[in-house]
Each structure stands twice: as C-alpha cells, then as structure tokens.
C-alpha cells in the first residue's frame, strides 16, 4: 500500500490500496477515483463521501494512528506526502480504503469512522455520494480511468474540481466516480486537509461531506463541511483535513482547486500526469523534492499539529462548512455553521448542524491539523499548498488564526475557532505564496482549457492578483497565471478553471444540449458569479454595508456572511476573502436582507483577492457564527458594523465608477490578504456549495462548479478576462461581480458561457433562486449587487444544472435573485438599479463576467460564420438588440422568459438583455451617461470596455472592424460606434455578437456614416446590442449557435452589453433623451449599423428595437434574416413569424451582403459546433422559406431597394407590425413581453434616431400612407395608399400571410424621394446596405415610443405612423409601400387585417400610429 500510496498519491494511477484490493482493482479504483477527484469536485464529493467515509475511519487509524508515521508513510507512498503529513496519512488510509472505498469505505468506512456525525450530515452527503458513487462505484474502474484521463487531459481538475463544485451537483452524475475520484481529489486537495487531520476531524468532515452529499449535491455535501473546509481549511485551515475531502470537495472550486491547482500546477510543470493517479504523484515524488520537504514537514507536523489543526479546523471547517453548506443547502450550511458555532456557543440556530458541529469539534485536532496544514501545505505539493496557504505556518497559522478571529471576527464565538480564526490569516498569507508555487500548473491548465475557467480567475486574479502580484493583473487573465502572482488567486483561478475545464470537456455538451444557451450561460454565469462574487461580493457590499459589516461584525456579520455564503454564492468568492461576510452575503442573497449586496460586495472583494481573503477570514468566523448568520436579518446590524472592515473593497459598490477603485483596492487587498486568491478558490467551492447547498434555487445550479469554471472565464471576462478592460475600464470589479449579475438566465451566462454576455440568461437559476429572489427582492437594490454575485453564481449553477429549466418561467420576483440577477437583475434589478444607473454600477461586474463568457466562448466558433453573417447579424443585432431592448428587458424578464421557449430562451434573452445592462453596466452606465450626457465619451468607454471584452471574445471579424470604427475611431461616432460595437460585440458574442456588431460594422463599412451616426449609431448599436442581447439570450438558449450562451449565459452579455443600457429604464430614458437629442444621429447611426447591411436588416434590427412600435416585428424580421438564422434556427421554428423574420431580414434587397449574411448561419456562432450546424441548417431552411415568401413579393418589393431603403426608414412601423410577430418566433421564448420590453427600452432609442430621421419625413404620412413590408426584402415601406391604387403583395409578418395592398402608382416615385432623403441622412448613405431599414427599424421603435412623443404631433394618424411617416415618409414610394406594409403589418399587429381591410385601411388608414401598431403587435405578440 505504501508503494501504491506513493504512486497513488492523490490522483495516483496505480493501485494505492493495492493491499486492500487487487492491484489491478486498486489501480483502477485509485486511478478512477483520484482522477475523478482531480477531475472535478463532483468527484471530490464522491471521493469525500467514500474517501472521507474511508478517511474518517482511516483518518482515525491513519490520521490519528498513522498520522505521524502514516503521514510520512502516506506522503511518501502516495506522493501525497507533498500534500500534507496528515493528508498523506489519511491518504495512506484512504488509499488503502479508497480502493476498497467504492465498496467498503464509501458508505461503510465513512460511517464507521464518523458514525455519529455521518448520520444526519453524512446521510445527506451520502445521497449525492450515492449518486456519485453509484455512478462511480459501478463505473469506478473504467469510468474512473476515463475520468483519470480526463484529469490527465485537464490536470487542472485538481483545481478544477472546486469550480466543478456546482457542477458537482449537476455533474456529480457526470463524475459518477467522484467517490473514487473523490479520493483522488481528496488526495490532491481534500486529502490535503483530510489526510492531515486526525480521524476525528476526518470523521467530522466526512460527516459533513456525507450529509452534504446526501441532499443529492455531491459537491455541496462536500461543501458543507468538506467544501467549507476545503475552502476554509484548504485556505485558512488547510489542515482541516478531517474534511480532507470536505475542504477539497466542499469548496473544491475554491480551496481544493487551489490545493489542486498548486498540485496540478506542479504536476503540470513537471509534465507528469498527476491526473494519471499514481504516475502523476510518483512523478511528483520524483520530480519535486520540495514537495517531499513539505511532506516531511507535514509528517512531522501531523503528530503534533494534526490534532491541533483539527481542533481549530473543525471550527474553521465548520464555520466554513456552514457557509459552504449554506451555499449548497441552507440546512446543510446551517448544520455546518452550527457545528462550527456549537463549540463557539453561538451556534444555536441549527441544532442538527450543531450536532454536526459537535462532531466536527469533537475532533479538537482540527486546530493542530490546521497548523500543520500551513506548514505541510507549504512543504508539500501544491495541492497541499492550499493547505499551507490555509494554515500559513503551523505556529504562526494558529496565531494568525487567533489574531484573525479577533481581528476578522472579533467575536467570542471564535474563542474556540481562534486557531481556526488565525489560521485563515496565515493560511491566507501563506497560501498566496504557495499559490505561486502551484500556480504554474493551474495557469497551464488555464491555457490548456478554453478560457472559460480563466475568465473567472482572471477576474479574481485581475482584482486579487494585481495586489498580490502587480505584473499578473492583465496577464493573469488565466486564473493560472494569476496564481503564480497571487497563489490564493491562482488557486482560486485554478480551482475555478479546473472545474470549468472539466465542464468544458465534459459538460459543454451537456450544457449546450441542456440549455444550449441558458445552461452554458447559466453555468458560465454561475462560475462567473462565483468569480465575481470572489472579487465583487465584498465590494458590492458598499452598496449594502452587509459585506463589509460582515467582515467587521464578527458574530453577526460573520453569520450573515456565512449565511450569505450559504445562500447565494457570494460565499464562493467572498468565502475566501471574507467568509463571514461572504456567508452573510450568500445568506443575504438567499435571504433577502441587506446582505444581498453584501454578497455582491463580498464577491467583489473576493475577486479583489483581499475581499476573497477577507471573506475567508470572516468566513471562518462566519462559520463560527453561521448559525447566527442564518438568521440573516439579525446579522445585518453586525454586517454594517463589519462594513467598515470591508469598506476597503466596499467601494466597489459603485460598480462602474468604483470598478477601477475596487480593482485597485482589490489589489491592495490581495497584497494585504495574499491568500485572496487562495481563499477565493477555497471560498469559490464553498460559494458554489453555498449556491448548491444554500438555496434550492441556487441549488438549481447543479454545477456552480461548471459555471464556476465558466465563471472563471466569466470572471476573467468580468474581472480579468476583460481584466484590462474591466480593471481599466471600470469593468474589473463591477464586472467581476456583476459579470454574473448579467447571469440572468442566458443572460447570466456571460457570453454564454455566457458568462459575461451570456450571463444574462442565467435565469435558469431564477427558478431556484426565485425563493431566494423573492426573499431578496425586498432588497432588490442590494440584490443588484448581491444578486449579481450570488444570483449570478446561482445562475451559473443553474446554467450548469438547468439553465434552461430554471430559466423557464421565473417570475421576476422568483427570479428576483436569479432572474433579478439574470432577468430581474436586468429586468427587475436592472429595471430598478440599472435603470437608475445604480444597478449598472453593480452590473458592470456582471457585464464583464458575461463578457467573460463570451471570452470563454471566445472560441466563437461562428466567428468565421459571423463574418458571413455579419450583415444579417447586424440586422439581427439591431433586431435582436431591439427586441432585447430595454422594454423587452424590463417587461420580458418577468414574463417572456418563463413563457416563451419554455421560458428558457426568453428568460435567457430577457436576462441576457437585462444583464446586458449588467454586463454593459459600464457600458450601460457609460451608455446611460452617453445617452443622457454625450453618448460619446461614455459610449466610447463602454465601447472600449465592451470592445475589449468583445475583442477578447474576438467573436466577430468585424468586431475588430467595429472596434476599429468604434474603438479606434476617435470621433464621437467612433465612441458611440465603439460602444455600440462593444455592445454589439458583447451582445453578439453572447448572443449575436455579429448582429450587434453588424450595425456598427455597417457603420464601419459605411465610414461616411460612421461619423454622423456616431452617436446615433452608438445608440443604435446600443439598441441593437440590446436587442441582440435580448435576442441573443433566446438565441443562445434555443439555438446552440450563439456564443452568447457563453456570453448570454454569463450575462447575456449581449444583453448586458447592448441590452443593458437600452434595457434598463435608466438606459431607456437615457436612450430616450439621447434619442430625442441625438435622434437624428441615432436615426442616421442606426441605419449605418443595420442599414449598411441591409435596409431591412438595419431596419429590422432597429425596428425590432422599436418592436413595440411595429419595428419589433421588423427587427425580428431583419434579425431573423441572419442572426435569426441562428436565432431563427431557434426561434423561427418556434414561431411562423420567425420565418417571416428571416424573410424580412433577408428581404432587405439593398444589402446583398445582408442577404448573403442572412443566407449564412447567424453571425454569433452557436455554442457548439453541432449547435452551429443546427443553427445554420435552421437558418438556411427558414431563410429559404422566407426567401420563397419574399420572392413572392420580391417583384413587388422590387420597387427598388432605394424604396426599400426608404422603406427601411419607414420600416419601423412595419417591423412593429410584421416582424413583431416574428420576433416571438425568432425569440420564441419571450416574444410578446420581450417585444414590448424591447420596445420599451428600444423605443426611446428608436425615437432618438427617428427623431432625426423623423425630421425628414415627419409629415409625409398622410392617412393614405401605409407601412408595409416587402416579403422579399423584408423591408417596411410607408405607402401612400391614396395616391395611386396599385395592388402590391406584401407580407404580413404578424400573420405570415401575403397581403395585397393597393399602393399608389406614384408609390415608387415617393419611394425614390424618400430614398434620396434616406440617402441624405447618413444612415441612408450606405452603398451596399440600406441604412434606411435600420433607420426604419429604429424609428419603428421610436415611432412606437419615441416617435409618439417626437412624431405624435405629426399630422399622421398616430405617433407611430407619424413617426414612421417622418422617418419613412421621405420616400413617398416608401411611404406608400410602408403604408401598404403597415396594412399588412398592421393586420398582424392587431386583428390581422384582411387584405381588403388593409387596402381600405391604406387609403383611410391615416397611417395607423405606431402606437396603434405597437398595441396590435403587443396584443399579437404578447
């Protein structure tokens, strides 16, 4: 066994329990189990369950008996010696029992060892364990081997498992072998703690682990005690090895990942496959004498220190478990907290957990183990290092812990927890140092993996590492690089990354399949939220003093923090930094108190690193006070007291403005805490666990780990992935936390993975978080921050677990936390806060995170596709953005997501486009500033941020173009364009990066218009981006094609970016102001964006933006053309209108490019290749159908693209009418509300562009004019019906039928003049593209809402028509055509008008006002 141990260190390949089982069996068992453990937290959980079960007994024997000898023996044997003496000891025991563990240890040894504790807690853990184990036991050999190889492939699994923690819930089945793998994992990370800790501690942790698992959350089970320990023990009390698995698995994403990160890092650096079980560890043994040193120290320490560590550790562990448990399961968390506090005497909330705490505390060795852990960690392998970081130094660790207790907690509860309390401090400090040691591996892993994991860590790294390591902030985008600089961060990053990688590898399919967009988005958002929470939870606190107060108020604040940790997921990142604070925040998230923002703030701090560390410290204390924290309301005062302490990071409350400050602060914090990343990592798992454990809603995110991994990406995007942009552009901190604020459904899937831009869609969390949300709704404003963090994390989890189901009808309040973070976040929270530009402050983190997801989805596989689809995408962006517009965001979040597309796409869309506000918070805030103020500089900044994110995403070919035009171009137009472009990019990346960019691209393509429409285009882009975000979410969800699932999943970053500003009322109002102020520009601009691509395209997108005004339909139509090819692939099938939309989008004959793009798959690539192909197929089919329909009228519509362009200008009316129905199709998920929502948000925007355009054709809409859509071009034309009765066939987008309308013969003539007019307008001056359509689209929206005020005075029948008349009227022909189209479109709008009715309407139409049309559309669409 010793020989085996040597080989089977933690992830040994060989049979580490050769003595117990067959050598082959053992080998396979160890290989599978350890590989799995390394592979994912789910594994870790399984491992903890079985191995911990084994570990308790073996820990008792090995840890207690062998602890000294076995420490060296196990360490020597398994190569885990590098991990920790106790760890080695436990490992030896574990290795021996683990191999038999699947059979015996899994349920037996664990129970025997921890017989008393496991009963209540273990059972819970066991349930998940059983699930994991069930899969693992039977599949232990082969499956484990496969997992082992996966681990080999993603050695970061060590660190990844913690991030996988949420995935553990979701992927636990995936990692069916976690039991065995759990052993592996434990060996790397949990073993760090478990091996090192005496049997008693192990039993306690096992008990914690088991109970946590029992609930069916493999990871959360580990999390309550083990996860908490993992995050707390590995970081603070690494030697809390009692829950070796627990710490490792419970907070696998944070703490174990850190440990594993270190280990993986070292392993990777060695090039050995630690994941290859024995060989990896052997390799390490051979290659890393330093690890041996650690092992020796560990060995020495185990005898004397293991007990002490466990004494402290149980408390730390317990407190942390409380958080962790709270996260996965509040009950669990409570138990953990109670356990933690039982000794403290403050744990009176949870009697059951109090018992558990007793079990945990029964093993006083925790304190020693904790002390040992630091040394061992330092001296042992990187996976152990997390422990060292946790324990810092044996003696100093205790002292530090003691100090920390008074310092951080300052509560009597921690007299017992004092060692533990001090432990985190040294551990935090040490861990960062160690993090650097094993950071390389995580970093490598990060590079290895898709940037998904990187994002979150980058976020934390950027925020946290900058302090720890000045050089690594930008470069640390990968969580791994950061780890080098800041070990804590690196570990956290690695941890997040590893699970993310794992999820990418293993769950990407599941994610894509499950909730193609929503699941990945939510997943990404969860992760992102986690990362965000890490960096942002704390800072967000400044919005709510809770997080800071948590830190300062030892008992209450800590409790709150712990509870918070338990609740949302703030715990995940905050847990590391400020456990108590995080817990509180998490709890606050879960329990709407003022803690919600705390959670965000904490998360922010976590990301800042110091925040994470602070959270970790506080978490320890909070663990001690978890019970108290459970009564969330009670701790708020303390939270406020603690506020000052966290005030450092608290600053981040102003997400946008303070993002930079927070980022900077994060850096100091990082330096200050040094364990920030480590703690963050540790906390991350806890947070994940908290998410899983705390609220059922949050539990929805089965894979906060996966989302966490994605969150890593998201975080990176939010915090560090777009760290430069984030940190520099104020995205850093805000985005960091809020990146998942965008986590709405899809929305919250950042970019689908949304993470940043996808993040928005992470409403999937919404369902579960609904409870949380409802609770937090009361603190919706704080929730904006906290929810952004916690809910985002939740969303991440939900995204992983059920991005699509949850996202389904989350009431805005039900989603208040999740949906509020995703949908309500961007819908309600965004409505409330972003609208007020307050949420935008928090949302930036979300935004960035969401963007991060797009970064993760940076593999926008459709980037090439995006190029071809650029025009259609532009249109789609316009359409989608319009649809995703503020109205959609505001309204739809509540209604459409749940309703349409099973509420998934809608929720995704809604939240995506809501989160866009979050995601675009900087963008939104900047946009708001831009729209309210100059729309230029802020836009530019936002554009820069978004461009950076988008650039990172590199989603679209024209992202650079747009970036060039928007980012590179200095003119206001450029700024606007850039902003719009950024938004488009974000939106596009997440949902339709191309669509959003298309308008901007169009702008770029039409440089002549670039300048004049600069502001308008920016607005337009924003609107379009909004739309795109919104649509993107649905698109991301329904259609795999969207990278937005990444982007949208994270935030619907597209939504967040584009939709954020348009989406939020604040943005909306700003847009309205800007619309009116820059109406002309916007009008001009909008066409340049969409117009250049295709009159219908721009018109469609813009119109979609004003979908409420009729442009919605058109926008969708335009959108349907290309983006909707992707999206329509998703939505068109959903609704016949989708076809029309596609047709409309393709119809814009003026833009061959547009049509070309329309012919191609949506610009924003689906999340997966398969999804992309599917999207392409659907798009092609729909396009063909649409084209057939178009061709019906193409001859009619052949009037001229000039007319079309003019018609496009007028199209807004029609889009509202026609595409509006189609919009639901395209956005099958939330068509009606979204339309209205989009209309709401977009109308103001539309108004503005149309304000200028309206100047041109304002009066031309006589009663004789009708707005009709050309089926061929999909453009809307205003026709002067009375002029000449010429029967023309128009396609009614609403009804999907062709209507013969009498169009005046002079129709073409008027069309010509309007065309000239349109051409006169910058937006109309697009050679290849018909800017008019864009204008049309924008005006449509505008006409509906903006036009009403702007054009209501128009003599025309109503403001809408007036508005359209004003915009579309310039070309009489277009007017006539538009009038005709209005007839057609109008029919769909309201009761479909029969052709005669339409014809009659045309002459006596008096131009149905866009309002009327909007009403019709609303009726029809809604």
Curated annotation (Swiss-Prot):
Q: Which residues carry this modification: Phosphoserine?
A: 327, 472, 815
Cite a single Pfam family from the UniProt record: DUF4585
Composition-biased stretches, type Low complexity, lie in 590-606, 731-744
Give the Pro residues compositional bias ranges: 1087-1099
Show the ranges annotated as biased composition (Basic residues).
1173-1184
List, in alphabetical order, the GO biological process terms annotated in this UniProt record: positive regulation of calcineurin-NFAT signaling cascade
Location in the cell reads: Cytoplasm, Myofibril, Sarcomere, Z line
Q: Where is the composition biased (Basic and acidic residues)?
A: 284-298, 305-315, 395-405, 481-495, 524-537, 579-588, 611-622, 635-644, 653-675, 790-801, 828-839, 975-991, 1185-1202
Q: Does this UniProt record's set of keywords contain Cytoplasm?
A: yes
Polar residues bias locations: 201-210, 342-351, 461-470, 907-926, 944-954, 1048-1067, 1353-1366
Please describe the quaternary structure of this protein.
Interacts with FHL2.
Name by which UniProt lists this protein: Cardiac-enriched FHL2-interacting protein
Species this chain originates from: Rattus norvegicus (Rat)
High-level lineage: Eukaryota, Metazoa, Chordata, Craniata, Vertebrata
């Amino acid at each position: 066994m010793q020989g085996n141990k040597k080989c089977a260190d933690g992830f040994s390949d060989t049979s580490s329990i050769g003595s117990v089982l067959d050598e082959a069996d053992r080998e396979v068992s160890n290989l599978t189990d350890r590989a799995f453990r390394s592979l994912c937290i789910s594994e870790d959980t399984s491992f903890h369950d079985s191995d911990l079960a084994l570990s308790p007994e073996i820990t008792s024997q090995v840890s207690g008996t062998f602890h000294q000898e076995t420490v060296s023996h196990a360490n020597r044997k398994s190569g885990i010696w590098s991990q920790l003496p106790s760890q080695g000891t436990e490992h030896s025991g574990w290795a021996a029992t683990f191999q038999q563990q699947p059979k015996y240890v899994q349920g037996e040894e664990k129970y025997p060892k921890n017989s008393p504790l496991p009963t209540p807690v273990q059972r819970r853990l066991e349930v998940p364990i059983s699930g994991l184990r069930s899969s693992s036991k039977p599949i232990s050999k082969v499956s484990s081997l496969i997992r082992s190889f996966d681990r080999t492939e993603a050695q970061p699994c060590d660190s990844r498992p913690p991030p996988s923690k949420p995935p553990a819930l979701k992927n636990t089945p995936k990692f069916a072998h976690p039991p065995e793998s759990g052993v592996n994992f434990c060996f790397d990370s949990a073993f760090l703690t478990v091996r090192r800790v005496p049997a008693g501690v192990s039993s306690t942790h096992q008990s914690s682990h088991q109970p946590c698992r029992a609930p069916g959350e493999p990871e959360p089970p580990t999390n309550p005690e083990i996860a908490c320990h993992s995050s707390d023990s590995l970081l603070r009390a690494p030697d809390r090895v009692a829950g070796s698995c627990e710490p490792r698995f419970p907070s696998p994403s944070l703490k174990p990942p850190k440990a594993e990160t270190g280990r993986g890092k070292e392993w990777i650096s060695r090039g050995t496959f630690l994941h290859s079980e024995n060989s990896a560890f052997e390799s390490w043994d051979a290659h890393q004498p330093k690890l041996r040193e650690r092992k020796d120290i560990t060995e020495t320490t185990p005898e004397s220190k293991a007990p002490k560590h466990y004494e402290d550790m149980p408390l730390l562990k317990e407190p942390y478990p409380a958080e962790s448990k709270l996260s996965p399961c509040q009950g669990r968390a409570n138990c953990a907290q109670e356990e933690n506090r039982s000794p403290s005497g403050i744990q009176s909330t949870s009697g059951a957990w109090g018992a558990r705490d007793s079990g945990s505390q029964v093993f006083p060795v925790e304190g020693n183990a904790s002390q040992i852990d630091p040394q061992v960690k330092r001296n042992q392998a990187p996976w152990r290092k997390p422990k060292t970081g946790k324990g810092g130094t044996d003696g100093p660790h205790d002292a530090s812990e003691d100090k920390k207790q008074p310092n951080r907690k300052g509560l009597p509860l921690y007299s017992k927890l004092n060692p533990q309390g001090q432990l985190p401090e040294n551990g935090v400090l040490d861990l960062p140092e160690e993090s650097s040691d094993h950071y390389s591996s995580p970093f490598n892993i990060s590079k290895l993996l898709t940037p998904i994991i990187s994002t979150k860590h980058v976020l934390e790294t950027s925020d946290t590492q900058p302090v720890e390591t000045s050089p690594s902030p930008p470069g640390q985008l990968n969580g791994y690089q950061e780890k080098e600089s800041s070990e804590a961060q690196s570990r956290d990053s690695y941890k997040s990354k590893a699970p993310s990688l794992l999820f990418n590898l293993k769950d990407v399919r599941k994610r894509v399949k499950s909730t193609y967009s929503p699941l990945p988005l939510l997943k990404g958002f969860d992760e992102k939220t986690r990362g965000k929470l890490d960096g942002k939870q704390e800072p967000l606190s400044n919005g709510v003093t809770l997080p800071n107060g948590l830190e300062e108020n030892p008992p209450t604040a800590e409790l709150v923090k712990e509870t918070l940790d338990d609740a949302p997921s703030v715990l995940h990142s905050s847990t590391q930094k400020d456990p108590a604070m995080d817990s509180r925040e998490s709890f606050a998230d879960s329990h709407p108190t003022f803690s919600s923002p705390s959670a965000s703030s904490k998360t922010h701090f976590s990301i800042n690193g110091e925040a994470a560390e602070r959270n970790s410290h506080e978490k320890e204390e909070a663990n001690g006070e978890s019970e108290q924290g459970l009564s969330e309301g009670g701790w708020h005062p303390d939270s406020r007291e603690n506020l000052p302490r966290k005030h450092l990071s608290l600053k981040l409350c102003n997400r946008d403005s303070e993002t930079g400050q927070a980022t900077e602060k994060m850096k100091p914090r990082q330096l200050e805490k040094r364990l920030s990343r480590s703690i963050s990592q540790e906390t991350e798992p806890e947070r994940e666990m908290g998410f899983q454990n705390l609220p059922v809603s949050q539990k929805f995110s089965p894979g906060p780990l996966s989302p966490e991994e994605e969150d890593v990406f998201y975080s990176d995007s939010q915090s560090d992935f777009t760290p430069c942009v984030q940190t520099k552009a104020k995205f850093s901190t805000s985005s960091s936390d809020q990146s998942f604020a965008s986590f709405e459904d899809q929305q919250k899937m950042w970019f689908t993975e949304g993470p940043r831009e996808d993040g928005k869609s992470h409403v999937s969390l919404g369902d579960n978080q609904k409870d949380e949300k409802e609770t937090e709704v009361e603190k919706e404003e704080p929730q904006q921050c906290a929810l952004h963090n916690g809910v985002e994390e939740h969303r991440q989890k939900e995204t992983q677990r059920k991005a699509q189901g949850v996202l389904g009808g989350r009431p805005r309040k039900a989603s208040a936390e999740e949906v509020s973070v995703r949908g309500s976040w961007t819908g309600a929270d965004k409505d409330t806060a972003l609208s007020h530009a307050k949420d935008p402050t928090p949302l930036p983190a979300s935004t960035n995170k969401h963007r991060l997801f797009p970064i993760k989805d940076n593999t926008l596989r459709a980037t090439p596709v995006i190029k071809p689809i650029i025009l259609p995408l532009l249109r789609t962006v316009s359409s989608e953005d319009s649809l995703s517009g503020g109205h959609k965001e505001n309204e739809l979040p509540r209604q459409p997501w749940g309703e349409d597309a099973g509420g998934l796409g809608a929720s995704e869309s809604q939240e995506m486009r809501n989160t866009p506000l979050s995601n675009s918070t900087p963008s939104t805030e900047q946009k708001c500033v831009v729209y309210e103020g100059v729309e230029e500089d802020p836009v530019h900044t936002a554009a820069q941020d978004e461009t950076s994110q988008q650039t990172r995403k590199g989603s679209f070919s024209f992202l650079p173009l747009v970036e060039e035009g928007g980012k590179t171009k200095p003119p206001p137009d450029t700024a606007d364009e850039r902003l719009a472009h950024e938004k488009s990019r974000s939106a596009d990346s997440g949902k339709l990066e191309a669509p959003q960019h298309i308008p901007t691209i169009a702008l770029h393509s039409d440089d002549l218009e670039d300048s004049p429409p600069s502001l308008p285009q920016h607005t337009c882009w924003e609107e379009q981006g909004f739309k795109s975000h919104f649509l993107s979410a649905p698109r991301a969800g329904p259609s795999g094609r969207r990278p937005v699932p990444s982007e949208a999943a994270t935030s619907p970053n597209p939504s967040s970016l584009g939709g954020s500003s348009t989406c939020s009322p604040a943005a909306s109002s700003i847009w309205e102001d800007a619309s009116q102020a820059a109406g002309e520009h916007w009008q001009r601009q909008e066409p340049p964006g969409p117009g250049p691509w295709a009159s219908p395209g721009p018109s469609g997108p813009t119109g979609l933006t004003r979908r409420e005004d009729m442009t919605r339909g058109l926008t969708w139509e335009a959108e349907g053309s290309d983006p909707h090819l992707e999206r329509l692939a998703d939505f068109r099938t959903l609704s016949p209108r989708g076809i029309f939309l596609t047709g409309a989008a393709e119809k814009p004959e003026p833009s061959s490019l547009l049509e070309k793009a329309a012919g191609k798959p949506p610009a924003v690539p689906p999340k997966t290749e398969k999804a992309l192909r599917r999207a392409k197929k659907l798009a092609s089919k729909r396009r063909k159908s649409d084209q057939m329909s178009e061709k019906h009228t193409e001859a009619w519509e052949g009037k001229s693209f000039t007319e079309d362009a003019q018609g496009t200008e007028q199209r807004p009316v029609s889009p509202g009418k026609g595409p509006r129905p189609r919009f639901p199709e395209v956005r099958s998920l939330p068509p009606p509300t979204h339309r209205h929502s989009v209309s709401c948000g977009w109308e103001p925007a539309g108004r503005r562009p149309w304000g200028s355009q309206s100047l041109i054709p304002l009066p031309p809409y006589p009663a004789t004019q009708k707005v009709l859509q050309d089926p061929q071009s999909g453009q809307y034309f205003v026709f002067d019906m009375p002029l000449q009765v010429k029967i023309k066939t128009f396609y009614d987008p609403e009804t999907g039928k062709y209507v013969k309308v009498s169009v005046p013969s002079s129709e073409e003539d008027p069309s010509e003049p309007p065309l000239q007019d349109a051409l006169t307008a910058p937006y109309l001056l697009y050679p290849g593209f018909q800017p008019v359509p864009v204008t049309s689209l924008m005006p449509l929206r505008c006409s509906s809402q903006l036009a009403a005020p702007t054009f209501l005075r128009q003599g025309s029948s109503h403001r809408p028509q007036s508005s359209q008349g004003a915009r579309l009227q310039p070309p009489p022909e277009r007017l006539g055509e538009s009038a005709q189209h209005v007839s057609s479109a109008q029919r769909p709008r309201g009761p479909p008008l029969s052709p005669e009715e339409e014809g009659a309407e045309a002459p006596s139409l008096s131009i149905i006002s866009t309002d009327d049309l909007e009403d019709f559309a609303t009726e029809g669409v809604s």
